[in-house]
Amino acid sequence: MINEIKKDAQERMDKSVEALKNNLSKVRTGRAHPSLLSGISVEYYGAATPLNQVANVVAEDARTLAITVFDKELTQKVEKAIMMSDLGLNPMSAGTIIRVPLPPLTEERRKDLVKIVRGEAEGGRVAVRNIRRDANNDLKALLKDKEISEDEDRKAQEEIQKLTDVAVKKIDEVLAAKEKELMEV
């Protein structure tokens, strides 16, 4: 029973860290990266379709993304979807290839992005702490029902705290790496 609670907490904490990494990958840095456009959907046969299903996105160089659209008729829709996104990008098309130059980030915009990233990381920490709380509540319920002893409860809570510390440390490492990436000129 205790092992199930610990395993569940571990899995949920790992998912929280992965979700944070995924969210942070969408934050624009000064460098071109295909995942930058991963959140963009294009209207395709009446359905919103992720960009990576209707086109191939590659980093042409450090400041340019190249998008090869599979269906010529979608080129304008892809361009429009990129312009309508809140990324502040201006695509230029040449046939079926769309080039998206990334303007350099201003110092002020970098600082704003760092604040956003820190907020995301704090959200990740809160999620991990909530998972710890849920696990500890499950342990208290077992203790109350006399399914485990107080010693087992205390030991399990200490182990869950260790899992929490590891997850928070991972979040801090991800945050530090993203901040460093954002502040590079």
UniProtKB/Swiss-Prot annotation:
Keyword Nucleus belongs to the record: no
Compartments in which it is found: Cytoplasm
CDD domains: RRF
Annotated GO biological process: cytoplasmic translational termination
Gene3D superfamilies: 3.30.1360.40, Ribosome-recycling factor (1.10.132.20)
Major place of residence: cytoplasm
Function: Responsible for the release of ribosomes from messenger RNA at the termination of protein biosynthesis. May increase the efficiency of translation by recycling ribosomes from one round of translation to another.
Matching PANTHER family: MITOCHONDRIAL RIBOSOME RECYCLING FACTOR PSEUDO 1 (PTHR20982:SF3), RIBOSOME RECYCLING FACTOR (PTHR20982)
This protein's name: Ribosome-recycling factor
Organism this protein belongs to: Vibrio parahaemolyticus serotype O3:K6 (strain RIMD 2210633)
Lineage start: Bacteria, Pseudomonadati, Pseudomonadota, Gammaproteobacteria, Vibrionales
